[in-house]
């Protein structure tokens, strides 16, 4: 078992009851183009087209053969683009239950599948996009290979769902999915990472390796798992996938149908009844959260409060990789002499306010509690960074765009979510996730 001691479990109010409920019905879903790093779409549909579930919507020009399919049947009502015609979202009004079917196999056949059979079914169904690489966090090329594949069956993000609750209901589909993934590269490890005290279903596979992690966040991030088990570099790549996509893989290969249901955490200080709800990938979050939120100006986030995406306008949908929806209040109010008050209702990792000494949960808002200023190395980053890197030096190199120095200090192992805690504790209010992405893009382009 690997124990993570450095990090932070955010004491935020609105923790979800770990019981699965039916969520609000949604009649609109979307694929969010900006979730896929570096993707340039070649559209196969236009507004007004009627599509079936599993039908191709677009293909990645930069990654030929990688296709993106409809999570539900219906009519294409909008193809939203931003600056420089960047694809923001492809919106579908859900109608009917028309679907495209794919190859299916019996449970006994799964362990005899060839790598090519697995790859072909994943690509044709669009489930290939559930896989992501490290470094760079991109959908892998269909011709590439990985040193190993990581399955993340734990989640330490604030307000997250407990994977064991979800997997208890889908244990057979999950083990079927593991079997399928083990056939993708039969001679290479398939790493299943789980919480040490969790009851996660497993199966007896030759290349399956099970790893237990415990401790504070980011113990549940795949970047942490990769760092301690099979570190990556410029010449070495691993792939990873989350546990609910493994369920989808299992269902695809045994039913021949694309499975796009999600069990997510709907939680946060502004949610009336924080709980786990069933919904669909790409669900319209305004519809999903209708009558679920407290009054006032709220920020709905697809993903974690630490590193999720703001859900509004053309991005008002559940992300492809998001397993939670978090809701906090907009912190627009100015405080009179806030900087000299005891602030018993605020939290600080540096113990500068009285709230730090209480054991209560806090109603966090979007307020940064200060403006941007110079980066101040006071040991905050080291407290929350469990990886074997020098965070202050790495963050400095990221800020100034020193790609050589950043590579030497380990930036290729990281994704935006791995630096979310550094952003949270930063006295200078830097957003290190977006800075990291700029550096990674430059490294990939220029070397």
Curated annotation (Swiss-Prot):
BP GO annotations: sodium ion transport
Q: Which InterPro entries match?
A: NqrA, NQRA_2nd, NqrA_C_domain, NQRA_N
Its keywords, alphabetically, are:
Ion transport, NAD, Sodium, Sodium transport, Translocase, Transport, Ubiquinone
Reactions catalysed: a ubiquinone + n Na(+)(in) + NADH + H(+) = a ubiquinol + n Na(+)(out) + NAD(+)
Q: Which Pfam families match?
A: NQRA_2nd, NQRA_N, NQRA_SLBB
**Enzyme Commission no:** 7.2.1.1
Q: Which GO terms describe its molecular function?
A: oxidoreductase activity, acting on NAD(P)H, quinone or similar compound as acceptor
Top-level class of the enzyme under EC nomenclature: translocase
Q: Which domain of life is it from?
A: Bacteria
Per UniProt, subunit arrangement is: Composed of six subunits; NqrA, NqrB, NqrC, NqrD, NqrE and NqrF.
NCBIfam families referenced in this protein's UniProt entry, alphabetically: nqrA, PRK05352.1-2, PRK05352.1-4
What family does the entry list? Belongs to the NqrA family.
Tell me the function of this protein.
NQR complex catalyzes the reduction of ubiquinone-1 to ubiquinol by two successive reactions, coupled with the transport of Na(+) ions from the cytoplasm to the periplasm. NqrA to NqrE are probably involved in the second step, the conversion of ubisemiquinone to ubiquinol.
Q: What is this protein called?
A: Na(+)-translocating NADH-quinone reductase subunit A
Organism field: Haemophilus influenzae (strain PittGG)
Lineage runs: Bacteria, Pseudomonadati, Pseudomonadota, Gammaproteobacteria, Pasteurellales
């Amino acid at each position: 078992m690997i124990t993570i001691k450095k990090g932070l479990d955010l004491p935020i109010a609105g923790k979800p009851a770990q019981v699965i409920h039916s969520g609000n019905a949604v009649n609109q879903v979307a694929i969010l183009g900006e979730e896929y790093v570096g993707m340039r779409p070649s559209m196969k549909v236009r507004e007004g087209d009627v599509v079936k579930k599993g039908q191709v919507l677009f293909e990645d020009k930069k990654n030929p053969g990688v296709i993106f399919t409809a999570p539900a049947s219906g009519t294409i009502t909008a193809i939203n683009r931003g600056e420089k015609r960047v694809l923001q979202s492809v919106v579908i009004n859900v109608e009917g239950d028309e679907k495209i079917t794919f190859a299916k196999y019996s449970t006994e056949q799964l362990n005899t599948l060839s790598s090519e059979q697995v790859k072909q079914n994943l690509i044709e169904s669009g489930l290939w996009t559930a896989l992501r690489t490290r470094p760079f966090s991109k959908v892998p090329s269909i011709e590439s290979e990985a040193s190993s594949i990581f399955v993340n069956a734990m989640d330490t993000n604030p307000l997250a769902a407990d994977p064991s609750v979800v997997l208890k209901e889908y244990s057979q589909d999950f083990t079927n999915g593991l079997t399928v993934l083990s056939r993708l590269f039969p001679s290479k490890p398939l790493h299943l990472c789980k919480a040490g005290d969790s009851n996660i279903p497993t199966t007896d596979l030759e290349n399956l390796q099970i790893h237990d992690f415990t401790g504070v966040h980011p113990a549940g991030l795949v970047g942490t798992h990769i760092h301690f088990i099979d570190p990556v570099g410029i010449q070495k790549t691993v792939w990873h996938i989350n546990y609910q996509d493994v369920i989808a893989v299992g269902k695809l290969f045994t039913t021949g149908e694309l499975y796009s249901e999600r069990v997510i955490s709907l939680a946060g200080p502004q949610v009336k009844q924080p709980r786990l709800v069933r919904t669909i990938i790409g669900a319209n979050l305004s519809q999903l959260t209708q009558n679920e939120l407290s009054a006032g100006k709220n920020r709905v986030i697809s993903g974690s409060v630490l590193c999720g995406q703001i859900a509004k306008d053309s991005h008002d949908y559940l992300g492809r990789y998001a397993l939670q929806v978090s809701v906090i209040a907009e912190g627009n109010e100015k405080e009179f002499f806030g900087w000299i008050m005891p602030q018993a209702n605020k939290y600080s990792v540096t113990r500068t306010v009285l709230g730090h000494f209480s054991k209560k949960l806090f109603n966090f808002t979007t307020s940064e509690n200060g403006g941007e200023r110079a980066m101040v190395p006071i040991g905050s980053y080291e407290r929350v960074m469990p990886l074997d890197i020098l965070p202050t030096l790495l963050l400095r190199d990221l800020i100034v765009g020193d790609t050589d120095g950043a590579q030497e200090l380990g930036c290729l192992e990281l994704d935006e979510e791995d630096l979310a805690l550094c952003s949270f504790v930063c006295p200078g209010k830097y957003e290190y996730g977006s800075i990291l992405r700029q550096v990674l893009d430059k490294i990939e382009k220029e070397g």
